[in-house]
Regions:
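PDZ/PDZ-like domain micro-motif
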Residues: 153-159, 212-221, 233-251, 266
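Conserved PDZ fold ligand-binding element
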Residues: 43-48, 166-167, 238-261
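Gly/Ser-enriched beta-turn/beta-hairpin loop segments
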Residues: 74-81, 128-145, 192-200, 211-226
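Conserved active-site neighborhood of the chymotrypsin/trypsin-like protease fold
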Residues: 2-6, 30-119, 143-144, 152-153, ...
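Short loop/turn microsegments at loop-to-beta-strand junctions
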Residues: 35-36, 154-156, 227-230, 244-245, ...
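C-terminal cap/linker of serine protease catalytic domains
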Residues: 1-18, 109, 162, 166-224, ...
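Active-site region of chymotrypsin-like
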Residues: 22-24, 83-94, 119-176, 183, ...
């Protein structure tokens, strides 16, 4: 009788997960047949890494079964690094359950070669953090990092957990880091991109730069660092509220503004239409101003 072989069992399990989910991973090709991987989100829409796709009029989507469809960009969001392509014909979509990433658990990153055939990489979930904001202002429900190596052509494919459930889409982060855009973020952002072409984000119409609060004012300000107003957009929320160039922004609704990331966190997709209180230093005095956050103008 053959001895039980755990490695063989693991190999067969991974093989089964790839077979079950390979329909999720597709190739997106341009006219020169360069390609990136993507996730087939629904029969007529694929999602991939925004940073990996240019601005061509048309792309070709190729599935593992060899089916092809012409696709055009429906929307893109640099903030969450997501881009959605809408296909001109429906493709056979694979349905898998959604899962949750856990530190130390196995992760299976799928991709596609230029002909649409599945590729697979096995690694570990190295960290799972709370909600965070990218430098471009995008809100992501979790910060998931993988201990795994991906080729650039494999970026944008689905990431599965050890049970074969979908936890998100792979993307290349800082050098040497592979991140996962969580399935919860995909579920929130993709419908917005399909309907509106972009994700609305809050806007104050202010150009800001970090600055130290002058020593004599720190006691009244209650802050050591703020954001100096360097420029003001004509007709923007800041100008309407009476903000002046040279003002130092201390807080927004009581939250300290000690860097651009903190400002971005106050101007996410949920902030549009809110009235907030700005606490400012002007001419050596601390004052407040109410401002209505509007949507950032389309680029």
């Amino acid at each position: 009788m053959d001895a039980h072989n755990p490695l063989s069992d693991l190999s067969q399990t991974i093989e089964a997960h790839v077979a079950a989910a390979q329909g999720l991973a597709v190739a997106v090709r341009n006219s020169s047949h360069r390609h990136v991987s993507a996730l087939l989100w629904q029969p007529d829409a694929v999602v991939t890494s925004e940073q990996a796709i240019g601005n061509r009029d048309e792309y070709e989507v190729v599935t593992a079964s060899g089916a092809t469809a012409t696709a055009r960009i429906a929307g893109r969001d640099p903030g969450t690094n997501l881009l959605v392509l809408r296909t001109d014909a429906p493709l056979a979509a694979t349905t898998v359950p959604h899962g949750t990433a856990r530190v130390g658990s196995l992760a299976l990153a799928l991709g596609a070669d230029a002909e649409g055939a599945a590729t697979a990489r096995l690694g570990l979930v190295s960290s799972v953090g709370p909600q965070w904001y990218s430098r471009a202002g995008g809100r992501l429900e979790q910060r998931i990092a993988l201990d795994i190596r991906l080729r650039r052509t494999e970026e944008g494919g689905p990431v599965l957990d050890a049970s074969g459930a979908l936890v998100g889409m792979s993307t290349l982060g800082p050098p040497g880091v592979v991140l996962v855009i969580p399935v919860a973020t995909l579920g929130r952002v993709v419908p917005q991109l399909l309907s509106d072409g972009q994700v609305p984000r809050g806007w104050l119409g202010l150009g800001l730069q970090p600055v130290a609060v002058p020593e004599p004012l720190r006691a009244d300000a209650g802050e050591t660092t703020g954001m100096m107003v360097m420029s003001i957009a004509a007709g923007g929320p800041g100008e309407v509220a009476g903000v002046k160039a040279g003002d130092i922004l201390l807080t927004i609704d009581g939250a300290s503004m000690r860097g651009l990331r903190r400002v971005i966190a106050q101007l996410d997709d949920q902030s549009v239409g809110k009235t907030v209180v700005l606490r400012l230093i002007r001419g050596g005095e601390v004052l407040t101003s109410n401002v209505v956050i509007t949507a950032r103008p389309r680029q």
